[in-house]
């Protein structure tokens, strides 16, 4: 009895110990998430959960990546998660990354979240130098990355040194030139300031449009050997298969677009490619590992499917997504226009306020100056009045002295002088008295004139005082603020109506909206052509400007190859591949075998 109870207890405890779930950590380009997954879950169950959590509908570009012995692998959708060769230590870690790249990012990437994830991944690949980017293009891409993060450039906010902690340029580019971080920031900021008005999603899309023209964008490279044992590189991307020299990952030697390939298969380490034309012999190559062949096959199948899908009509789901994206873009555009109008009106109101404050300050200064002038006039008038009074008193005193002298002269004349000497002395005194009297009279006349002049100056000073008081009165009675026209309230934006019926989404535009949007689209096309030409000129100008600061001895092999391509008038990546496919598939296969 006791033994049976013990066996039941041990069985139940064993049953409790068996886990029903396991923990998974998902690492995206800008976040980490953890999920509890059921033991029976397949790769598709986990992948769908991650996509739902991110709100991502363009799932066909992405996958869950893990590493096996330094080799990249992708989670298979139809296989249990724990049946993969992954670490059994929890949490089991996967990286949510773009597995396949679009041919044209602007046309194919519909959702904003899709664009954002691609932007982050491509930016990291450029900074980690997994994608070669020439120096002048690196500066331009950095300016769009700054616009996406910081918004419009504002000199009062984005002061010198605000990019000091940002990783914006590949280390290879920084080491290639004798330039300080401040010099790089100055050049990045000069372009950043030109991107005013671009929203985050627009700046990120501009980044991708430039990056997708880089030679190594979206290419997965694998070391292979042909029948002769020559070491080569196989490049797999959205356009097809490309064969490279191991020392030159920029320009393929030959290319096979997906529409020329009928079948792809491998056996052990040998890979077989069957061209669409059955008259052409298959061509084979060997890879280093069986696991690598599995990865090559996955990438070939996925890229081929997307290549064919792009050349067919969009599915209903994609059509709905694109319609919804257009509606969302139109709504955001209208919202941005409304905000721009409000911002413009606010700036105008602030300018009007600043002008009024300036005029008020000016009027205050004028009033202060008028008061000071009035005070000086009053002081001058007081001084002149005092001086006139003193002069008048002096004139009276001189007149009194002159009268006394006259009286003295008369008294002397009336006095009888008996002797001739006394008479002569008396005549001399009389003469002196007359001279003194004449001087006194002249001085008195001069003082009188001076008093008259002072009275006239006093009258003028009082007139100046009256004018100063009048001006002060005029300033005081002026209106402080000029009449302002009332600022009209922002008009409500003409937001289109959204009607959701079942799974269908309808979008109604007014005729005026459609005409306006058509005009804006046409205008954007013209502006884009002008900007493209201007952009190339700017890139060439920057390249010339910093060329003198380049340290030639630090150039990498890819730098040298890129410069040689440029010197030969190198064309774009797509044009290069197009030229390589002008030869017949048969001659290209033969060329591959002879490499």
Swiss-Prot record:
<dbReference type="GO" id="GO:0005856">
    <property type="term" value="C:cytoskeleton"/>
</dbReference>
<dbReference type="InterPro" id="IPR000299">
    <property type="entry name" value="FERM_domain"/>
</dbReference>
<dbReference type="GO" id="GO:0043005">
    <property type="term" value="C:neuron projection"/>
</dbReference>
<comment type="subunit">
    <text>Interacts with NHERF1, HGS and AGAP2. Interacts with LAYN. Interacts with SGSM3. Interacts (via FERM domain) with MPP1. Interacts with WWC1. Interacts with the CUL4A-RBX1-DDB1-VprBP/DCAF1 E3 ubiquitin-protein ligase complex. The unphosphorylated form interacts (via FERM domain) with VPRBP/DCAF1. Interacts (via FERM domain) with NOP53; the interaction is direct. Interacts with SCHIP1; the interaction is direct.</text>
</comment>
<dbReference type="GO" id="GO:0014013">
    <property type="term" value="P:regulation of gliogenesis"/>
</dbReference>
<dbReference type="InterPro" id="IPR041789">
    <property type="entry name" value="ERM_FERM_C"/>
</dbReference>
<dbReference type="GO" id="GO:0031647">
    <property type="term" value="P:regulation of protein stability"/>
</dbReference>
<dbReference type="GO" id="GO:0048471">
    <property type="term" value="C:perinuclear region of cytoplasm"/>
</dbReference>
<dbReference type="GO" id="GO:0035330">
    <property type="term" value="P:regulation of hippo signaling"/>
</dbReference>
<keyword id="KW-0043">Tumor suppressor</keyword>
<dbReference type="InterPro" id="IPR019749">
    <property type="entry name" value="Band_41_domain"/>
</dbReference>
<dbReference type="GO" id="GO:2000177">
    <property type="term" value="P:regulation of neural precursor cell proliferation"/>
</dbReference>
<dbReference type="GO" id="GO:0032154">
    <property type="term" value="C:cleavage furrow"/>
</dbReference>
<dbReference type="GO" id="GO:0003779">
    <property type="term" value="F:actin binding"/>
</dbReference>
<dbReference type="Pfam" id="PF00373">
    <property type="entry name" value="FERM_M"/>
</dbReference>
<dbReference type="GO" id="GO:0032587">
    <property type="term" value="C:ruffle membrane"/>
</dbReference>
<dbReference type="GO" id="GO:0030864">
    <property type="term" value="C:cortical actin cytoskeleton"/>
</dbReference>
<dbReference type="GO" id="GO:0014010">
    <property type="term" value="P:Schwann cell proliferation"/>
</dbReference>
<dbReference type="Pfam" id="PF09380">
    <property type="entry name" value="FERM_C"/>
</dbReference>
<dbReference type="InterPro" id="IPR029071">
    <property type="entry name" value="Ubiquitin-like_domsf"/>
</dbReference>
<dbReference type="InterPro" id="IPR014352">
    <property type="entry name" value="FERM/acyl-CoA-bd_prot_sf"/>
</dbReference>
<dbReference type="GO" id="GO:0001953">
    <property type="term" value="P:negative regulation of cell-matrix adhesion"/>
</dbReference>
<dbReference type="InterPro" id="IPR011993">
    <property type="entry name" value="PH-like_dom_sf"/>
</dbReference>
<dbReference type="GO" id="GO:0045597">
    <property type="term" value="P:positive regulation of cell differentiation"/>
</dbReference>
<comment type="function">
    <text>Probable regulator of the Hippo/SWH (Sav/Wts/Hpo) signaling pathway, a signaling pathway that plays a pivotal role in tumor suppression by restricting proliferation and promoting apoptosis. Along with WWC1 can synergistically induce the phosphorylation of LATS1 and LATS2 and can probably function in the regulation of the Hippo/SWH (Sav/Wts/Hpo) signaling pathway. May act as a membrane stabilizing protein. May inhibit PI3 kinase by binding to AGAP2 and impairing its stimulating activity.</text>
</comment>
<dbReference type="InterPro" id="IPR046810">
    <property type="entry name" value="ERM_helical"/>
</dbReference>
<dbReference type="InterPro" id="IPR011174">
    <property type="entry name" value="ERM"/>
</dbReference>
<dbReference type="GO" id="GO:0005769">
    <property type="term" value="C:early endosome"/>
</dbReference>
<keyword id="KW-1003">Cell membrane</keyword>
<keyword id="KW-0963">Cytoplasm</keyword>
<dbReference type="GO" id="GO:0030336">
    <property type="term" value="P:negative regulation of cell migration"/>
</dbReference>
<dbReference type="InterPro" id="IPR018979">
    <property type="entry name" value="FERM_N"/>
</dbReference>
<dbReference type="GO" id="GO:0021766">
    <property type="term" value="P:hippocampus development"/>
</dbReference>
<keyword id="KW-0539">Nucleus</keyword>
<protein>
    <recommendedName>
        <fullName>Merlin</fullName>
    </recommendedName>
</protein>
<dbReference type="GO" id="GO:0046426">
    <property type="term" value="P:negative regulation of receptor signaling pathway via JAK-STAT"/>
</dbReference>
<dbReference type="GO" id="GO:0042475">
    <property type="term" value="P:odontogenesis of dentin-containing tooth"/>
</dbReference>
<dbReference type="GO" id="GO:0030036">
    <property type="term" value="P:actin cytoskeleton organization"/>
</dbReference>
<dbReference type="GO" id="GO:0070306">
    <property type="term" value="P:lens fiber cell differentiation"/>
</dbReference>
<dbReference type="GO" id="GO:0000165">
    <property type="term" value="P:MAPK cascade"/>
</dbReference>
<feature type="modified residue" description="Phosphoserine; by PAK">
    <location>
        <position position="518"/>
    </location>
</feature>
<dbReference type="GO" id="GO:0030175">
    <property type="term" value="C:filopodium"/>
</dbReference>
